[in-house]
């Protein structure tokens, strides 16, 4: 595509009943090995979902350290989406789950950044950590940096406040 820093999102939560690709570690390794062989030395970001199991996260970090330059954590979290009356809010037959983003997932993003920082330090890994999830106000940026993020990204927060990055820079 010509991207200067491609990101491979292995964490999309709307895969039906299947697990996220990033939870299937052997599959993840094959995919990222292939990507690395195609892009050569171009910096590469691996986007992941939330890991409850720390042993699995360590194994993922080993894969990332070998094939990626950065881990972007996290993507949206799957959740049941209902309207104010408790009815299915998403269009489509039996489509009750969707990706939840914004402030409700910040705890998970901060947790992943802290754990990835600890893993990186313990195993002397070299990948960068991009903190994502629930960055709505400037203080959220500070929380991610203090947790160990090398960079902080915002999607939902930037949609609601297009000046968020400028406010963070001026702080």
Model-derived features: positions:
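Conserved beta-alpha-beta core of the PfkB/ribokinase-like small-molecule kinase fold
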Residues: 1-59
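Glycine-rich phosphate-binding active-site loops on the catalytic face of alpha/beta enzymes
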Residues: 70-80, 134-135, 141-168
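Short beta-strand/loop segments at the ligand-binding rim of alpha/beta enzyme cores
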Residues: 37-49, 118-131
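Glycine/Thr-rich beta-alpha phosphate-binding loop at enzyme active sites
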Residues: 4-26, 60-125, 167
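Glycine-rich beta-strand-to-loop/alpha-helix junction loops that act as flexible
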Residues: 1, 47-49, 129-135, 154-156
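Catalytic cores of alpha/beta
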Residues: 52-66, 118-122, 135-152
């Amino acid at each position: 595509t010509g991207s200067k820093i491609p990101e491979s999102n292995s964490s999309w939560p709307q895969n039906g009943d299947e697990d996220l690709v990033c939870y299937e570690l052997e599959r993840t390794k094959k995919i990222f090995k292939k990507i690395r062989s195609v892009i050569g030395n171009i910096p590469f970001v691996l986007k992941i979902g939330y890991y409850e199991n720390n042993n699995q996260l360590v194994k993922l970090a080993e894969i990332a350290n070998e094939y990626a330059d950065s881990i972007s954590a996290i993507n949206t979290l799957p959740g049941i989406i209902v309207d104010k009356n408790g009815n299915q809010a998403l269009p489509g037959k039996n489509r009750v789950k969707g990706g939840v983003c914004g402030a409700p997932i910040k705890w998970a993003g901060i947790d992943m950044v802290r754990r990835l920082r600890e893993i990186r330090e313990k195993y002397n890994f070299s990948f960068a950590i991009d903190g994502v999830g629930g960055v709505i106000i400037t203080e959220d940026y500070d929380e991610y940096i203090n947790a160990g993020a090398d960079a902080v990204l915002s999607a939902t927060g930037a949609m609601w406040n297009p000046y968020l990055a400028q406010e963070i820079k001026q702080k």
